[in-house]
A protein has these predicted regions:
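Soluble catalytic regions of large protease machineries
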Residues: 1-160, 164
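Short "domain-exit" segments at the C-terminal end of structured domains
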Residues: 165-169
């Protein structure tokens, strides 16, 4: 099944390392589409499947590889197998610890999902305006998104501001 829409996250600068806060923000971003579905339509669809998969990979790496777990601290719980082929992470722990890791990953994803819902509810008017713009134009750039967001947050009429970027030929 194909995607009806997607978000492409383009880094502002080339980076090789991410902070814990940046990874936590990525999780919230990945889960934002599912959270918006629940808020706006009071239901969820299969549309967020890839986002959930990506969020789970990031959360699991935070816990097992990056030492970003309160419970496990700096303990390396996974290593890369065939780094240059599949790059798959393999757990270096017993079944009980693997179960605890799953629990930590679920908690991190749950917190991130709740944070996404909180932010979307807090900025619901901007969400609706941006969705309306996206429906009429089919695509939106980061700059256009931020213009609409800032205008709504400042209480400005959208009809009074120029939103779309000039077309390049």
């Amino acid at each position: 099944m194909g995607a009806l829409g997607y978000v492409m996250q383009v880094p502002e600068e080339e980076k090789y390392l991410n902070t814990q806060k940046e990874l936590e923000a990525m999780l919230v971003g990945y889960l934002g589409g599912r959270a918006a579905e629940e808020i706006v339509f009071d239901t969820v669809t299969t549309g967020a499947a890839n986002d959930i998969e990506q969020a789970t990979k990031v959360a699991r790496a935070m816990i097992t590889q990056y030492g970003m777990s309160q419970k496990f601290g700096l303990m390396g719980l996974a290593s890369q197998e065939n780094q240059y082929l599949s790059g798959r992470a393999v757990l270096n722990c017993g079944d009980d610890t693997a179960t605890e890791i799953d629990h930590e990953v679920m908690q991190l994803l749950h917190y991130s999902y709740e944070e996404a819902k909180r932010l979307l509810n807090e900025h619901r008017e901007a969400l609706d305006k941006i969705a309306g713009y996206l429906i009429s134009r089919e695509t939106i750039t980061g700059k256009e998104f931020m213009k609409i967001f800032r205008a709504v947050e400042k209480g400005l009429e959208l009809s009074l501001i120029h939103i779309s970027e000039p077309t390049r030929h």
